[in-house]
A protein has these predicted regions:
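A broad detector of short, well-ordered amphipathic alpha-helices
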Residues: 23, 27, 45-48, 65, ...
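Catalytic Zn2+-binding segment of zinc metalloproteases
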Residues: 12-24
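Single conserved hydrophobic/aromatic residue that forms the stacking wall/gate
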Residues: 1-10, 14
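An active-site-proximal "capping" alpha-helix that borders the catalytic cofactor pocket
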Residues: 21-36
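Divalent metal-dependent phosphate-bond-processing catalytic cores, especially two-metal-ion Mg2+/Mn2+ enzymes
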Residues: 16, 35-38, 55-161
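Short, well-structured alpha-helical segments
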Residues: 2, 43-51
Length: 161
């Protein structure tokens, strides 16, 4: 997979845009995993997780998809923004660019998955963050529930979820 997509998601390689990236990623992964002779049941689990990770079309259906969703939706950080030309940024780029620190912590004893963010509010307000990311955080909450855990979100030191 690294040879195919060293720094982009599989779906983004196929379609250089966000629309339908989960579905494209699932199709590409299925082809790659089949060529690697992965057993069908394992391949189906992975492809299903990839196909269900987008907030517009999916949701966690098992613990594998829950793990994928939590990993994907909590991956918010400045280095995700590829362009140096700020005039080309969309709202997703601005939100990612504004996050100066992001830590995902799992506490087994407390059965808690926590995302701690530091957001530069001169770049992106909390309202703008939640306008884009509220649905994603709700997906994380549901994914955490499949693990029997609670999802917590802290932004700039304030408990949000």
């Amino acid at each position: 997979i690294r040879d195919v997509a060293p720094s982009r998601g599989l779906g983004d390689v196929y379609k250089r845009q966000r629309e339908h990236h989960a579905e494209y990623g699932a199709l590409l992964a299925n082809d790659i995993l089949r060529r690697m002779d992965m057993p069908f049941t394992d391949r189906a689990t992975i492809v299903s997780a990839i196909g269900h990770h987008d907030e517009s079309t999916g949701g966690a259906v098992d613990i594998v998809s829950a793990a994928m969703i939590i990993a994907d939706k909590t991956d918010v950080r400045r280095s995700r923004v590829r362009s140096r030309d700020k005039s080309t940024y969309d709202i997703h780029d601005w939100v990612n660019y504004a996050v100066t620190e992001a830590n995902l912590k799992i506490n087994r004893e407390k059965r808690q998955i926590a995302l701690e963010l530091k957001i530069d509010e001169k770049i992106c307000t909390m309202y703008e963050y939640f306008d884009i990311f509220l649905g994603r955080m709700q997906m994380c909450r549901h994914g955490a529930e499949l693990f029997g855990a609670k999802f917590k979100l802290t932004a700039n030191g304030s408990k949000v979820l």
